């Protein structure tokens, strides 16, 4: 079920506070580290770089206009695909 039209998009208050602080200090090229993967990317975030925490490290995410309306967690994978291991059968001649 999708979110109600009456409600605004969810964005954690501390993320908004960090963004407003970065814009006020004109630090648009610095990375803003956040843990809130469930926050929605808003229009005012375009051009900023966020470090989204994936449980181990901060993954840098540069926000562009195609990302607006999506969540930060979509751009920071938490699981690493190691691939399928090779066939361990010994070849016979």
UniProtKB/Swiss-Prot annotation:
Highest taxon in the source lineage: Bacteria
Protein species of origin: Ehrlichia chaffeensis (strain ATCC CRL-10679 / Arkansas)
The family this protein is said to belong to: Belongs to the universal ribosomal protein uS19 family.
The name this protein goes by in its record: Small ribosomal subunit protein uS19
GO MF annotations in UniProt: rRNA binding; structural constituent of ribosome
Pfam families to which the protein is assigned, alphabetical: Ribosomal_S19
GO biological process, one term: translation
UniProt-listed InterPro entries: Ribosomal_uS19, Ribosomal_uS19_bac-type, Ribosomal_uS19_CS, Ribosomal_uS19_SF
Keywords: Ribonucleoprotein, Ribosomal protein, RNA-binding, rRNA-binding
Organism taxonomic ancestry: Bacteria, Pseudomonadati, Pseudomonadota, Alphaproteobacteria, Rickettsiales
Annotated signal sequence range: none
The protein's role, per its UniProt record: Protein S19 forms a complex with S13 that binds strongly to the 16S ribosomal RNA.
GO cellular component terms listed in the entry, alphabetical order: cytoplasm; small ribosomal subunit
């Amino acid at each position: 079920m999708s979110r109600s039209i009456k409600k605004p998009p969810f964005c954690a208050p501390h993320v908004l506070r960090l963004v407003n602080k970065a814009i006020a200090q004109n630090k648009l090229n610095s990375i803003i580290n956040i843990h809130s993967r469930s926050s929605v990317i808003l229009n005012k975030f375009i051009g900023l770089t966020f470090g989204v925490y994936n449980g181990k490290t901060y993954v840098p995410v540069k926000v562009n206009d195609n990302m607006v309306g999506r969540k930060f967690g979509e751009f920071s994978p938490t699981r690493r695909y190691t691939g399928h291991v090779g066939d361990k059968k010994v070849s016979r001649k």
